[in-house]
Amino acid sequence: MRAVRVVRHARPAEAIEVRDDVPIPDVEPGGVRIAVTAASLNFGDIARCRGGVASVMASPPFTLGMDVCGIVEAAGAGAEEWIGRRVVGITNQSLGGMAEYALAPATGVFEAPAALDDVESAAFTLPFHTGYLALHRRARLQVGETLLVVGGASALGTAIIQLGVAAGARVVALAGGPEKGEVCLGLGAELAIDYTTEDVFDRVMTHTGGHGADVVCDLIGGERTETIWTCVAHDGRYVPIGFNDDPQSGLTGKPLRKVSMGNFSVVGVVLGYSTVPLDYRRFGLNPFPPHVGPEVHAALTALVDAGSIRPVIGRRISMAEVAAALEDHDQRRTTGRSVVDLTLAGPGAAR
C-alpha cells in the first residue's frame, strides 16, 4: 500500500518518503482496519520525525498519522460491529494513519459526523475531543467565565474557541499575527491578542477588568508560560495541553512557586480512552476510561449538527505534500488543520 513513511530521524523534509511498497497491516483483536480516505497532520508528527521526545519515540521506518476518516473494512474479535461503517479513528499508538489502510483500537473509533465530509471528519476527532475533555471534564468551564486560548489559530485552538463560545464563555485568543487573530475573531473570540507585538498581561487585564482568565488553555508552552500564568484569575485553572514551543520542557525549570503565589490550579489533560496496565501508570499515563469516548463524541456530534462547531481546514494536501506541510507547521505558517486527502494524486491535483 501507499504510505507516508519516516525513514530516518530528522526534520520532516529529510525524514519523510512516500512509499508504495508498505505491507497492509494485519487487524488485531479488539481493533479495526480502516480503508483511509483522509488523515490529519499534527505537531506530534514533527516530534516523531525528529525522534527526540521519549513519549512519542518510534524506530524508523514507520508510518505517520494519528487520526483518520474512512470505512472499516476488517475487524478483530470483539470489534465486528464496526465493519462497513464510515468512521473517524485515533490510530494504534498514534501512528499509521497516513496510508491507504490504518489500524485503530475499537475504543478510539467513532461514527463520522454525517454533516462533515471526509476531510473535515479527519480534522475533527483529535482537536475537538481534546478540547471538550479540557474544558468540560477537567477545567469545568462555566457559563460567563473568561477562557484564554494560547495558540488560538491552530487546529486545537480553533476547536477550543468554538467549544468555549458554545459553552457560553467569553473567549480571548492569543495568536501570532493579525491574520491569525482575524481567524480567531471569526470563530467568536471577543478579543484577539498578537503575542508577538502586544503586552499580553495588559491586554488580558484591561479586557477582564483586572479579573484575569478563569480558564487558560495553553497550546504552546515554553518561554511565554510565566507571562501566561500572570493572566490566570484567582481560583482559575491553567490547562497545559501542548508544548509546541519546546516539546521536551513543558513546565520543567519553571518556578512553580508562581503557581502557589497566583492561587490557581494546573490541570492536566491528554486524549485517550483505555484501561492501561500499571506499568503504563508508572510512566505517568492515565487516560480516560473507555466509556467516556462515546459520551464525548455524542456531545460533539450534537454540536456539529446544531451548527455550533466545525473544523477549520487550512489545507487539503496529497501524501507528496506532507513533508512541506509539516515544515510549515513547525514554522507557524499555518492556521487550522492540514489534512491529507487520499483522493489527491500529488501537488496541485484537483479533487
Q: At which residue positions do the language-model features occur?
A:
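C-terminal capping/lid region of NAD(P)-dependent oxidoreductase domains
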Residues: M1, A298-R316, A323-R351
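N-terminal glycine-rich beta->alpha transition that marks the start or flank
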Residues: P12-A13, D21-C69, G78
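NAD(P)H dinucleotide-binding glycine-rich loop of Rossmann-like/cofactor-binding domains
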Residues: A35, A47, V88-G151
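A glycine-/small-residue-rich N-terminal strand-loop-strand element
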Residues: C49, V53, C69-Q93, A115
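Short glycine-centered segments of the SAM/dcSAM-binding site in methyltransferase folds
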Residues: R86, T146, R170, G236-R237, ...
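Mid-domain Rossmann-like dinucleotide-binding core that forms the NAD(H)/NADP(H) cofactor-binding site
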Residues: F124-E198
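Short amphipathic alpha-helix with an adjacent loop that forms part of the alpha/beta core around
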Residues: D199-G209
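Glycine-rich phosphate-binding loop and adjacent beta-alpha segment
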Residues: E223-A306, T343-R351
